[in-house]
Amino acid sequence: MNKSIVILGGGTAGWMSALFFKKAYPQSKVTVVESEEIGIIGVGESTTPYFIEMLDFLDINVLDILKASDIAFKTGVKFDGWGKSIFYHPFNLNDEHYNHDTALIQYYLKNKNTNVFKTLNPLVAITEQGKIQKIKKNLPHNDFAVHIDACKTSIALKSIALSRGIQLVQGVVGSVDVKDNNVASLILNSGYRVCGDFFVDCSGFNRVLANKFNIKFLKFNDLLTNTAIPCPIKKTFFEPYTTAKTLNYGWTWKIPTHSRTGTGYVFSRDYTDTDSAKKEFYTYLKTVTDEEINLNKIIFFETGTLEKIHFNNVLAVGLASHFLEPLEGTSLAISVIILFEFIKQKEDFNNKVLQKILQIKDFIVLHYLTKKTQSNFWLDASKKARENNLIQKLLSSKTLNFDLFKDNDHYFSFLNHLNFLQNLDAIDTNTSVSTEHYKTDFNYKELLKSKAWHYSHVKNAVDYKTYYEQFL
């Protein structure tokens, strides 16, 4: 790898990238160019297990930075108002039994079980009881994630990075010097020049380096939201999950950390004005807390991705590379995917990452396949979802088609999609699975084994609040 790597931008994405490149290429000089004048947007506070995998790769134990980063544990997402009733999208338990014999899934489907995940994954029952699985030092990567305070996590990662020899240059980039169609240096407003062999664009929505090379931004027109009103509140909730609750023109997030709760309203300005959205969000927040509410910060965004994540001698990471609304907390996950895929140095890197982002986008679109009629926003969002190619294939199959996901390279599995199709009441629940890919017959002993496994996990779960406070 190149001798000198320059990261443009701090924040979680910037310092995470710096640590990643230093670990992957220990002989390289890594420099972060950061400006306190610009600051960070502070999104991406609900993560997925990919964040834990990244920390593990960087030799950072999440338990060691828990206090500094105001981290709280997360086992999934609670959806309120999206379907006929509240439902959960839990992470998968890291247990070989969760690679369920497909005959078991067939059994539950044929018996019209409306929530396969609730039956097959004990994390739902555990979460509903306000409990959590005990988390061990040798942490598995797919059964839990964390809620973070983006600013505090950025500071914690920065501290670790500086202790590992990563350099910091403070200042605002005024111009970019390009030679032979590659970035040669970043020129700060002070006149100081930061030279490098390879550059990582973590400049957020500004996309400084991507714009310098006129990299095309692919808009996701089947996702309608374009505005967010973030509002952290002091009240805390000992809930090991993110809550996504629908309002008239979008949805709200609730992300509890140790010392506060991140909340926000994601909506579309094409269906309501910002002042009306503030009033609606304010009314909702007053049902959650009685504290003073500040709704002055507004984030305008465009959903989509760069056509090329790696171009010339530049790699785009974080908001500089893409943006998807945070329904499943995939922002940092996609950044981790970009970094891991990049160090593999495959020729099809751009296409592989683009396909992964598109797959995740399709899954986010699936969330809007609702029967909500409270506004034109929800009617149009549902219409857009039904026009999505993957969703059309899922809905048009006479039987639920596992083969759509048989390459096993999807970030979200068939069961993830099935969970939403059923809970959003988008398909009949008396469906069965019948493909050449799965031929096993139902075995009653396997059903008993499944129930015993399910019960043992629920039985061994502990009170979340008590367990969490042991770490503080």
Regions of interest found by a model, annotated:
Residues 39, 43-128:
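Dinucleotide-binding Rossmann-like beta1-alpha1 core, especially the glycine-rich loop
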Residues 266, 295-351:
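A conserved active-site cap/scaffold subdomain adjacent to cofactor or substrate pockets
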Residues 14:
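N-terminal Rossmann-fold NAD(P) dinucleotide-binding loop
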Residues 247-300, 322-333:
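Conserved FAD/dinucleotide-binding core of flavoprotein oxidoreductases
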Residues 139-277:
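Predominantly flavin-linked oxidoreductase catalytic cores and closely associated redox partners
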Residues 2-11:
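Beta1/beta-strand and adjacent pyrophosphate-binding region of the FAD-binding site
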Residues 22-43:
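Glycine-rich FAD pyrophosphate-binding loop
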Residues 73, 345-472:
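Long, low-complexity C-terminal extensions of enzymes
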